Amino acid sequence: MPRNPKSFRLAARNIFLTYPQCDIPKDEALQMLQTLSWSVVKPTYIRVAREEHSDGFPHLHCLIQLSGKSNIKDARFFDITHPRRSANFHPNIQAAKDTNAVKNYITKDGDYCESGQYKVSGGTKANKDDVYHNAVNAGCVEEALAIIRAGDPKTFIVSYHNVRANIERLFTKAPEPWAPPFQLSSFTNVPDEMSSWADDYFGRSAAARAERPISIIVEGDSRTGKTMWARALGPHNYLSGHLDFNSKVFSNNAEYNVIDDIAPHYLKLKHWKELIGAQRDWQSNCKYGKPVQIKGGIPSIVLCNPGEGSSYISFLNKEENASLRAWTTKNAKFITLEAPLYQSTAQDC
């Protein structure tokens, strides 16, 4: 039996409305809610979301936050009328006990509009699970932190750095896969030895490749196209300037490594033999980083410029590196570029 309108009373700061089978555009519905006959207590935030319901009709869900506790006694207070036809809509009305949960629920389809400044609620202190559930489902890092601050202030203060680090990790987006700006076919001046190396390795299936493939060390002036050529060959790890085996930038599923402008004396101190020698199943030991297990078994394309401190050939020709030179010549081919790898002036890296 319907509730007697005279017995209706809504005393709440946060209100959750659902208008079933309501086809009023969400932005127009928001304006209608803003212009209701509010008394002293007025909306500080409104979010209106459209849901395509299973019954084939759109529903509107609304979250309203007020400047104070309401005292609404008119059951028809939230009724709205379609702006272009004579159709009235009456909502289901509830107090929103957990505004974060309501906010996340009504916008699960992503079709919403809003007005005002949302006030974060962390849920009840007695139920920390709700706090962290709401934080995980927040829209951004700062919103998640605000939820935890409100709902679990002790943990927020005592373990702030850990809490922030964990939240930032959860909200970190995977980097976009690198796309070469130039097609491999645009490199028309590649030395035969480089082309043969690439054809031999990439022309085989993974199962048919050598257990430890040969790497190549390519030395040439800047803007000869060596970086763009190396990066256009296939899925790879790009190590530039220093070694970083963080899982965000280094993948054990890559087909080869590109080692670009990493000083030879630095690589000698780190993982020269592991990377150039295509060694398998080894562990990184880079300073300031946690040890990482590397699958390996893939070749490296080492790119360098001529000159002291940059040239791998000059570095290996030093007397103190004689044994390393002997090892490297068995595990890598050396190529010196005499001209750019392309004919036009488009590629300059």
From Swiss-Prot:
Region (Oligomerization): 154-174
Motif (RCR-3): 105-108
Gene Ontology terms: cellular component: host cell nucleus
Binding site for a divalent metal cation: 51, 59, 61, 109
Binding-site list for ATP: 220-227
GO BP terms: DNA replication
Signal sequence bounds: none
Database matches in InterPro entries: CRESS_DNA_REP, Gemini_AL1_CLV, Gemini_AL1_REP, Gemini_AL1_REP_central
Localization per record: Host nucleus
Annotated catalytic residues: 105
Keyword entries, A-Z: ATP-binding, Covalent protein-DNA linkage, DNA replication, DNA-binding, Endonuclease, Helicase, Host nucleus, Host-virus interaction, Hydrolase, Metal-binding, Multifunctional enzyme, Nuclease, Nucleotide-binding, Nucleotidyltransferase, Transferase
Subunit structure comment from the entry: Homooligomer. Interacts with the replication enhancer protein (REn). Interacts with host retinoblastoma-related protein 1 (RBR1), and may thereby induce the transcription of host replicative enzymes even if the cell is not dividing anymore. Interacts with host PCNA. Interacts with host SCE1 protein.
Function description: Essential for the replication of viral ssDNA. The closed circular ssDNA genome is first converted to a superhelical dsDNA. Rep binds a specific region at the genome origin of replication. It introduces an endonucleolytic nick within the conserved sequence 5'-TAATATTAC-3' in the intergenic region of the genome present in all geminiviruses, thereby initiating the rolling circle replication (RCR). Following cleavage, binds covalently to the 5'-phosphate of DNA as a tyrosyl ester. The cleavage gives rise to a free 3'-OH that serves as a primer for the cellular DNA polymerase.
The record's note on its domains: There are 3 rolling circle replication (RCR) motifs. RCR-2 is probably involved in metal coordination. RCR-3 is required for phosphodiester bond cleavage for initiation of RCR.
UniProt-recorded name of the protein: Replication-associated protein
Native organism: Cabbage leaf curl virus (isolate Jamaica) (CaLCuV)
